[in-house]
UniProtKB/Swiss-Prot annotation:
Keywords (A to Z) from UniProt: Ribonucleoprotein, Ribosomal protein
Family: Belongs to the universal ribosomal protein uS2 family.
Presence of keyword Membrane: no
GO BP field: translation
Disulfide bonds, paired cysteine numbers: none
Pfam families the UniProt entry points to: Ribosomal_S2
Taxonomic source organism: Rhodospirillum centenum (strain ATCC 51521 / SW)
Name of the protein in its database record: Small ribosomal subunit protein uS2
Gene Ontology cellular component list: cytosolic small ribosomal subunit
GO molecular function: structural constituent of ribosome
Amino acid sequence: MAIPTFTMRQLLEAGVHFGHHTRRWNPKMAPYLFGVRNGVHIIDLEQSVPMMYRAMQAVRDVVAGGGRVLFVGTKRAAQEKVAESAKRCGQYYVNHRWLGGMLTNWKTISQSIRRLKEMDEQLAVGEQSGRTKKELLNMTREREKLERALGGIRDMGGLPDLLFIIDTNKESLAIQEANKLGIPVVAVVDSNSDPDGVTFPVPGNDDALRAIDTYCELIAGAVLDGLQAEMSAAGIDLGAAEEAPEEVLPAEGAEQAPAQA
């Protein structure tokens, strides 16, 4: 395997170059803008292409070193693709709502994940657990709420080593927490985005479905290449496997120091 390749034409066809109306721009994005067309900022793809490759290389290197990547995209346009792509490459995701402290208060989050797993076990045996139907119904509702919030990280086993983010404005809290812990951030930055705090920015449209699909596919491909490198170093042929291998997780609740950029 190798890091996926792509062309500027592919980015154009996906609408990556379309920013927002000029009145909604963030002046910090000025260096990444090509110009204005019909009142809309046009993103400079001459910069987006090498910056995407740089971001993909960072993702690949983190994974090749045994690190974990957390995909974050809670806006409606990104939710499905973020989850799908993370699962495809054996990584983790948050696509419902970012809970405050999801990184900086990992101990409490771990307790909630443990509670989720306990409820799964209890609901599996149903009334044999000695609980009434009403108690089981209430537990089912609680479990569904926790699954929406934490289902994508229930098996992460510790802090991620890199975040991949769609929409820095919506996910500003995730970026703040990652910055506080020294976890590198790869993020798509639109013309109305704040690139501060993003280790590997990728200038591009963060609203169009085709654009979001493109970013997620490329990052997932970089993850898979990193897994191949990690497995090859261990003498395992990932190419012969149909799915990404399951990660060997540390003990429940154990924290892992994030990789530095």
